[in-house]
Design a protein with these regions (language model features):
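Conserved catalytic-core motifs of GNAT/GCN5-like acyltransferases
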Residues: 136-141, 153, 158-178, 190-191
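Conserved active-site alpha-helix within GNAT-family acetyltransferase domains
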Residues: 110, 114-116, 143-161
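GNAT-family acyltransferases
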Residues: 1-106, 127, 131, 173-174, ...
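Glycine-centered helix-boundary capping/hinge motifs
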Residues: 109-111, 129, 133, 156, ...
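Amphipathic alpha-helical segments that line or abut small-molecule/effector binding pockets
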Residues: 22, 114-126
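Conserved hydrophobic/aromatic "anchor" residues
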Residues: 16, 123-125, 157
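Amphipathic alpha-helical recognition patches that constitute DNA-binding helices
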Residues: 12, 23, 98, 102, ...
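Conserved beta-strand-loop-alpha-helix junction that forms the acyl-donor binding cleft
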Residues: 104, 108, 123-125, 138-149, ...
Length: 193
């Protein structure tokens, strides 16, 4: 399912492509990013190269490269990946999906992730011919990442539950907090803004 390009003010979301493998590789070697997302799997560079080259054609998911939207003389200033946002586990019967976000370190806390999520939610809940017409978008966020939890809450995600001690954090444990936003909650939030 090749994702559509989703343009915004600060960021432009486009399908992940083979040349993005280098930046994805960097992301997988960011210790703090790995810690905050609970990523424990390791991958070879060849696996990342292969994945980046083929992920746009995989069913049941949309994987976008988050890129800067800045323009100069009618051209994009950069098309470099600064983060990745994913809708996966898309279930057309229950009209639900899972959301995942990862930003490269230099781009965290600057509003890029917020805008990327807003664009993906607009696409996910759009009931027009170009939207997914989803009813629910869920995610997991680790308790060691309160900044991400606050971001998701500010975008309308509601805490549904907690998986206690679900991830290792060095010698400690971290809970996985399950959050979601439903289509009526999303529409009410958009009307209110």
């Amino acid at each position: 399912m090749t994702p559509p390009v989703l343009p915004g003010e600060m960021v432009r979301l486009r399908p992940i492509q083979a040349p993005d493998a280098e930046r994805l590789w960097e992301s997988l070697h960011d210790p703090e990013g790995m810690r905050l997302t609970g990523t424990t799997a390791s991958f070879t560079r060849q696996q990342i190269d292969d994945w980046a080259a083929t992920v746009a054609d995989r069913d049941g998911r949309f994987d976008w490269a988050i890129t800067p939207a800045a323009m100069r003389d009618g051209e994009l200033v950069s098309d470099d990946l600064i983060g990745e946002i994913v809708l996966n586990d898309i279930d057309p019967v229950s009209r639900s999906a899972n959301l995942r976000l990862q930003m490269l370190p230099d781009y965290r806390g600057r509003g890029y992730g917020r805008e990327a999520i807003e664009q993906v939610l607009r696409f996910a809940f759009d009931d027009g011919p170009d939207g997914l017409r989803l009813h629910r978008v869920g995610l997991d966020v680790l308790s060691i990442n309160p900044r991400a939890k606050a971001l998701y809450a500010s975008l309308g995600f509601v805490e549904e539950g907690r998986l206690r001690d679900a991830y290792r954090d060095g010698d400690d444990w971290s809970d996985a907090i399950v959050m979601s936003i439903l289509e009526d909650e999303y529409r009410a939030m958009v009307r209110g803004s």
